[in-house]
């Protein structure tokens, strides 16, 4: 609800970062988790990229599987409040979309379980039935656990690259280390389903 797609190709979202001091995606997140049906897959096509601007992905299957049995049992059935507060504030929107989704979700095709989280406090501020103060310490643990170096892939962009990922079992982070150098990437998202 906060983005503008190309008129000529309504499924294509242009991502331009010219002249910006930072990027809204410069944090660990899963795309559009505040929607009823967040995207299943995302595809990025690098049209013009500077040196730098890498994108990193964390494997949320591994993040879940590496948890202790006690932590898995505690998280089972917990839901998080995912909000679009960060994007809403950037565009001056008065309504903030929000949804509660499982913190551990089951992939509808593979049947595997993964951690389903996003980093910024204004994107996933709390667990259902808990306050932010109660939720943040556990969320911080889950974030740190998820992004251990051996659980992260870092892609060094080159013009012409096309990368696709499964938004249901990864988090990603766009590194903004290229100043105001031109960066032009197109994104297409494939419709997902309600997380379960």
Region roles according to the model:
Residues 1-162, 167-196:
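Non-heme Fe(II) oxygenase catalytic core, chiefly the N-lobe of the double-stranded beta-helix
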């Amino acid at each position: 609800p906060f983005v503008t797609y190309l008129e000529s190709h309504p499924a294509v979202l242009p991502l331009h970062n010219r002249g910006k001091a930072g990027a809204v995606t410069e944090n660990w997140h899963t795309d559009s988790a505040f929607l009823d049906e967040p995207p299943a897959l995302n595809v990025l096509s690098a049209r013009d990229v500077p040196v730098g601007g890498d994108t990193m992905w964390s494997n949320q299957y591994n993040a879940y599987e590496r948890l202790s049995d006690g932590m898995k049992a505690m998280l089972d059935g917990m839901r998080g409040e995912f909000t679009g507060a960060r994007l809403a504030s950037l565009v001056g929107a008065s309504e903030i979309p929000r949804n509660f989704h499982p913190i551990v979700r089951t992939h509808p095709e593979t049947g595997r379980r993964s951690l389903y989280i996003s980093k910024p406090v204004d994107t996933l501020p709390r667990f259902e039935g808990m306050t932010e103060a109660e939720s943040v310490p556990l969320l911080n643990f889950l974030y740190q656990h998820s992004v251990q170096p051996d659980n992260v892939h870092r892609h060094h962009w080159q013009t012409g690259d096309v990368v696709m990922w499964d938004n249901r079992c990864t988090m990603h982070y766009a590194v903004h280390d290229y100043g105001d150098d031109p960066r032009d990437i197109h994104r297409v998202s494939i419709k997902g389903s309600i997380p379960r």
